[in-house]
């Protein structure tokens, strides 16, 4: 079994054989390496927006694996058996009989894949594949014969920085690593297109999905649950969909493997239902349930039925097929046959999975997925060369670069990666909905949905930003360039509001973020065009920040309420713009040097974080007046900026201005093409209330525990939308996005 298939079967990169991974890397490496700019400049296939089923307006699917009645892996924690029932034909028939979606994702190849896809089409089902191979023109035959019943090829988790330990020829800069990565993706996507597979999808839990799309991938499908926050994953895919004018975007729910909560938690299966509704209301048009409904696979929760299967081998590294282990395996296989009913399609857990999917399918036939994409009037910027993860892992290295980290510890996850946590916790809170278990997958949207806009290779325009987003917030890593700086200037002068800090304007490509300098800043610190000042040096270290006045300002800051410890030098500034262009929003508590500055510029403004570090470094909050629920100085800045971006529809508490505690349990979205608002109460045990403010009206909403509600709203014409995006349709196609 090759490394990529094994990786997909277990959804766990550690299972991929290093040798096979290196083989894939060798196959995907082009003879001539291109620069990122050369890859970006290559023409992409003409975008044809994917048509969706008329009855559901959504592809709802599940993975189809071989049931072979044998052990795939051993280990006291990772033993994984494949049961014997069902065969392929029985899976297809049962899918139709029980209404388990309308799409199947096949893991098979060549003639077997063609025959399965043919039968699926006859049964009225759609097909896609993952990790599949085809020879002798078979891919083109599948694609042409299936027509609109064929969705394309998913290369899965084929690409990762951390799978490879050989650093030869990879370089030691972020740019070199990104280009090496993009070259491999670009070649593989081109090979798939040349073979005739049709649209190319990527299913991955990594945060570098934007580089895969920049290199030519057409349909992003984040592997939700291992990715972490499903709402954040939607923001990434949705932002890429708009930015690259993609055919559609989807979600791959690896719930059985990565929901992680035990079956003894009464909400285990409720979280799968929540995931389907979350993706429906955030704009996905393809949702695949990875496993669990036709057979169980996972041992990643302590009371999984898989944990009751025989475990003849202590170590996962034991070679279960070796001759010396054959007697153990044969004895265990005989015992396992007696327990296959615990993990095959007849098992109670598998039936629960199918019930959730069939119920959701029935719901979609009654309430088809909303047309278009939800209103998202602000975005979090994923900076150029931000190659870390979506969350902060203290023991993790960016790009898996542990060898580089031995020489430069800044290659370990640090303040840049923590800054993603800062913005997420401020505006995308994760309520404790699964107590006593932790919630790491579901965030609310008290400040509205946002997109993630990618600055990868600086392949974005000010026109796109102005067309789509009132506010752009930088949080994690960014390597700035003169090109990017010009984009930001044009965005602000055109009316955009930009939240950005000193560290984001550094040109560093080597993770030397603890040693910032004026010389390393873009334009050597001359931010006159963007902010109206130059950075000429640094102040002494400042320890506390506070409000500039005894009266509360727009951030809610007041003098003598301290934020800190800071322990940070501030930027020493030389102002060139008129004094009235600036407003101090936070200052140090000794000399009133500015921590946060509002800088008006043209039709827009910059909210500038004036310290020599990434945002999270200034978000500690244990000073005078701090309270349990506080989100820190930077957190309040992000919240304020999100409020500035409010669209036609938003929610608040009873003060009609700010989201309250109940709003932190509610996910909502508004689809202007559909003219409907969607609300989901993430609290499975209590009612939650909000004031739904839409188009000047105010409705007092009370959501029952776990309730999903659809509210009629205003359907907008194209020229009435606060945000717009382009579509390219084939003649005769109807617009669905």
Features from the language model and the residues they span:
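Catalytic beta-strand/loop cores that center a nucleophilic Ser/Cys/Thr
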Residues: 507, 539-602, 614-619, 642-693
